[in-house]
A protein has these predicted regions:
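Alpha-helical transmembrane segments and immediately membrane-proximal extracytoplasmic
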Residues: 1-405
Length: 405
C-alpha cells in the first residue's frame, strides 16, 4: 500500500467520523422530539379515553395525507429495504415529517402500533442524503445503515443492539461490516444525544440470574422455541392480513374506516370492562410485567392481534415495542410452568420474540444485555439462537433478503 493510499484511507475515516457524529446528533435530537411526543400523546390518550372512538376518522386523515403527500414515501420501511438492495435510489425527505405526524395520530386515537420502525425510517432518510457527497465504495448502503442504527439507538438508547440490527437486518445471514464503524459512532452519539435532551432509557436491571444446569438449559431452549413461534406467528399473521384486507377492501379509505371503527369499539370495550388496555405501544403491559411480575394469560395474544389488525388497516407506527410487550407478557405466563424466575423469563421473551419476528440474531441478544444487564447473557444467546433457527423467510419485513448458502 502506498503512502498516498494510506493518506486517502485516513481522510476517508476522518470524513466518516465527522459525518457519523453529525448524523448521530441530528437523528438523536429528532428521535427525542418523536419519542417525547409519543409519551405525551400516550399519557393524554389514557386520560381522555373517548378519543379512541375517533380512530376511524383519524385513519381517513392518515390515508389522505399519504395520498396527497406520500408518493414513494408511502412504502415506508419497504422503501428503506429497496434502497438497501439498490432497487431504489433515494428516500424522499417528506417521509420524515409524514411518518412522525401520522404515527402520532395513530397513537393519539388508540391504534396499537409501535415506534421503532418509524425511528429507523427517520434515521435512514436523513443519513442517506449524505451519501451523494462522499466518494467511497458502497456509500449509499453505508450511510443508509448508519442512519438506521442511529434511529434505533436514539429512540431505545441501546447503541450496540442498534448497530448490529442495522448491519444484519437487510440480508438475513450476512453482516454488512463495511458500515460497522460509522454505524457504531452514530448509534452512540444518537443514544447520548436523545438521553441528554431528556428522553429516558428503558432499563430493567435483573437481580435474579439462572444457574447453569442441564435442566435450565433445556428449559431455556424450549422457551426459545415458544418465543420464536410467537414471533413468527406475528410476522406471518401480519403478512397474510395485509394481503387479505387489501384484496377484500381495495379502497384504502373504506378499509381503514371500517377496520378502525371495529377496532375502536373492541379496544374501548376491553378497556372499560377491565379486561385490558391494548392501545398504543404496549409499554403499560411491559411495565406491569417487570414491575409487578404479572400479566393476564391472554395479554400476549390480544396485543399481537390488535397490532397486526391496526397495521394491516393502514395505521402508521412500528412493530418492535408491541413485540417487546408480547414477549414479556408471554414470558410471565410461561415462567411458572417451567419453575423459572418470572422476570428472567419475561426478559428472554422480550428479546427473543423481537429477534424471531425480525429474523435477527445479534440485535436481540444485545437488547437483552443492554436493557436487562449481562448476567443472563448466555441464556439470551440460547433462546435467541433457537428462535433464529425457525424459517427465516417469515419476517415482518417483506423487503428483507435471505442470503444464499
Amino acid at each position: 500500500m502506498t503512502s498516498l493510499s494510506i493518506k486517502q484511507k485516513a481522510q476517508q475515516y476522518v470524513l466518516l467520523t465527522g459525518m457519523a457524529l453529525f448524523i448521530g446528533l441530528l437523528v438523536g435530537a429528532i428521535d427525542m422530539i418523536f419519542g417525547q411526543g409519543l409519551l405525551l400523546i400516550g399519557d393524554f390518550r389514557s386520560q381522555h379515553w373517548p378519543l379512541t372512538l375517533f380512530l376511524a376518522i383519524a385513519g381517513l386523515v392518515i390515508v389522505y395525507l399519504y395520498k396527497r403527500f406520500g408518493g414513494k414515501a408511502s412504502k415506508g420501511m419497504g422503501l428503506v429495504f429497496d434502497v438497501g438492495h439498490v432497487r431504489e435510489e433515494k428516500i424522499p425527505l417528506v417521509l420524515v415529517p409524514l411518518i412522525m405526524l401520522t404515527t402520532w395520530i395513530s397513537h393519539l386515537f388508540g391504534g396499537s402500533v409501535g415506534r421503532e420502525g418509524v425511528a429507523v425510517q427517520i434515521g435512514a432518510t436523513l443519513s442517506h442524503r449524505f451519501a451523494r457527497h462522499v466518494k467511497i465504495p458502497d456509500a449509499s448502503r453505508i450511510f443508509l445503515m448508519t442512519g438506521m442504527a442511529a434511529g434505533f439507538a436514539g429512540l431505545f438508547q441501546t447503541p450496540l443492539a442498534a448497530t448490529f440490527f442495522a448491519l444484519e437486518v437487510l440480508t438475513v445471514g450476512e453482516l454488512q461490516l463495511m458500515a460497522l464503524y460509522p454505524a457504531l459512532i452514530a448509534s452512540i452519539v444518537a443514544s447520548f444525544t436523545s438521553h441528554a435532551l431528556g428522553l429516558e432509557k428503558v432499563a430493567v436491571p435483573l437481580k435474579e440470574t439462572l444457574s447453569w444446569t442441564p435442566e435450565n438449559l433445556i428449559k431455556v431452549a424450549l422457551l426459545g422455541l415458544a418465543f420464536g413461534l410467537a414471533g413468527k406467528l406475528f410476522a406471518v399473521s401480519l403478512s397474510w392480513l395485509k394481503k387479505t384486507v387489501a384484496k377484500v377492501l381495495p379502497n384504502p379509505y373504506i378499509r381503514i374506516a371500517l377496520i378502525g371503527a371495529g377496532l375502536s369499539l373492541v379496544l374501548l370495550t376491553l378497556q372499560l370492562t377491565k379486561v385490558g388496555t391494548y392501545s398504543g405501544l404496549g409499554t403499560n403491559l411491559i411495565d406491569v410485567a417487570f414491575h409487578q411480575g404479572s400479566a393476564q394469560s391472554y395479554d400476549w395474544i390480544l396485543k399481537l392481534l390488535f397490532t397486526v389488525v391496526t397495521i394491516s388497516a393502514g395505521y402508521q407506527g412500528g412493530e418492535v415495542t408491541p413485540l417487546f410487550a408480547i414477549g414479556a407478557t408471554l414470558g410471565v405466563f410461561l415462567a411458572p410452568m417451567l419453575g423459572l424466575p418470572v422476570l428472567v423469563v419475561a426478559a428472554i421473551g422480550y428479546a427473543s420474540v423481537f429477534g424471531s419476528a425480525t429474523t435477527t440474531l445479534l440485535a436481540p441478544i444485545l437488547i437483552g444485555g443492554e436493557v436487562f444487564g449481562y448476567a443472563n447473557l448466555p441464556f439470551f444467546v440460547i433462546a435467541c439462537a433457537i428462535a433464529y433457527c425457525l424459517p427465516k423467510e417469515w419476517s415482518i419485513y417483506s423487503g428483507q433478503k435471505v442470503a444464499k448458502k
